[in-house]
UniProtKB/Swiss-Prot annotation:
Pfam families: Memo. The lineage of its organism: Archaea, Thermoproteota, Thermoprotei, Thermoproteales, Thermoproteaceae. Belongs to the MEMO1 family. It comes from the Archaea. This is MEMO1 family protein Pisl_1105. Signal peptide: none annotated.
Length: 281
C-alpha cells in the first residue's frame, strides 16, 4: 500500500497530534475565524469550496471558515482535493487512485472507485504518486478535514499545467464522475490568492478575482489574473470547481472570509491573499 507521509508537518502546521488539535481550535476561535466548528448551512446542498493552503498561523483562521460552513451541510463520503503543483514534479495533471495519506491525526484512505471514474472521463490524468511527494497544497487541507469530519475518504489531484482548457476538462470530468458515483462528494479547490505585494494592493487584486468566482466565470477569472498580474497559485483548481459547479447545477457562491497574511501576521508590506468561498444550491 502506498503511504504518502507528511511533508510539511512541523513547518506549515504542528507535527504533534495534541498541539495540532489545539492549533485547529485556535484557527476556529481566532478573531478572523468562524468562531464555531459549524455554521448554519446556506442552502440545501453544497459542492465544496475554495480554501487557502499557507502555514496555519497565516491562513488557518480563513481556511476554518469553509470547513465550518461545509460541516453545516453534513459529512460527505469523500473529499476531492485539487491543488496546484508548486514544484513541477511529475505529471501535468496527476491523481492518486490508491493508498493513504498520513497526518499527525491519523490516516485517510483514497477512494479508488471515484478516482477511477474521474480518470475515465479525463484521459490525461495520470496516476502519479511522485507528483504529490512534496506538495503542501493538498496536505494542509487534510487535518482540517479530519478535525471537522473524522474518518472520510479523499481523492487528491494536483495540476501544474494550469490552463483554462485543463480546468474545463477536469471540471467536466469531475461533474460526470460525481453523477455516476451517486454519493456525496465535496470538492476543495486549494489556492492562495495574490502573492508578495502590499496588503492594500493584494486586497484590491484579490477582490477582482473573487468577483469573477462569485459570478461562476472561469474565463473572466483567467482573464483578470492575466491582465492585472494577480498571482493566484491555484487558479486551475478554482477553474475546475467553477466548471463542475455549473455542470451540476450549483449556482450559488458566497465569500465567507477574505484576508491577507498582513491581517494575521501584522506585516503588511509583502502579503499573500486568502479566501474561503463556498458553492451550494
Amino acid at each position: 500500500m502506498r503511504v504518502r507521509k507528511p511533508a510539511v508537518a512541523g513547518y506549515f502546521y504542528e507535527s504533534d497530534r495534541e498541539k495540532l488539535l489545539q492549533q485547529l481550535e485556535w484557527a476556529i476561535k481566532h478573531e478572523l475565524g468562524p468562531k464555531a466548528p459549524q455554521i448554519p448551512k446556506l442552502g440545501a446542498e453544497t459542492l465544496g469550496g475554495v480554501a487557502p493552503h499557507a502555514g496555519y498561523i497565516y491562513s488557518g483562521p480563513v481556511a476554518a471558515w469553509v470547513y465550518s460552513a461545509l460541516a453545516g451541510f453534513g459529512k460527505p463520503d469523500v473529499f476531492i482535493i485539487i491543488g496546484p503543483n508548486h514544484y513541477g514534479i511529475g505529471a501535468p495533471v496527476a491523481i492518486m487512485k490508491s493508498g493513504v495519506w498520513e497526518t499527525p491525526l491519523g490516516r485517510v484512505e483514497i477512494d479508488g472507485e471515484l478516482a477511477e471514474k474521474i480518470m475515465r472521463y479525463f484521459k490525461e490524468l495520470e496516476d502519479d504518486f511522485h507528483a504529490f511527494s512534496r506538495e503542501h497544497s493538498i496536505e494542509v487541507q487534510i487535518p482540517f478535514i479530519q478535525y471537522f469530519f473524522g474518518d472520510v475518504k479523499i481523492v487528491p489531484i494536483t495540476i501544474w499545467r494550469q490552463t483554462l482548457s485543463t480546468s474545463r476538462e477536469l471540471g467536466k470530468a469531475l461533474a460526470n464522475a460525481i453523477r455516476e458515483y451517486g454519493r456525496r462528494a465535496y470538492i476543495i479547490a486549494s489556492s492562495d490568492f495574490n502573492h508578495y505585494e502590499h496588503h492594500d494592493i493584494t486586497t484590491k487584486k484579490d477582490e477582482m478575482a473573487i468577483g469573477k468566482i462569485l459570478q461562476l466565470d472561469e474565463t473572466g477569472l483567467f482573464e483578470v489574473a492575466s491582465k492585472f498580474d494577480i498571482s493566484i497559485c491555484g487558479i486551475g483548481p478554482i477553474g475546475a470547481l467553477i466548471v463542475a459547479a455549473k455542470e451540476l447545477g450549483y449556482k450559488n457562491v458566497t465569500l465567507l472570509k477574505h484576508a491577507t497574511s498582513g491581517d494575521t501576521s501584522g506585516y503588511r508590506e509583502e502579503t499573500v491573499g486568502y479566501a474561503s468561498i463556498i458553492f451550494y444550491r
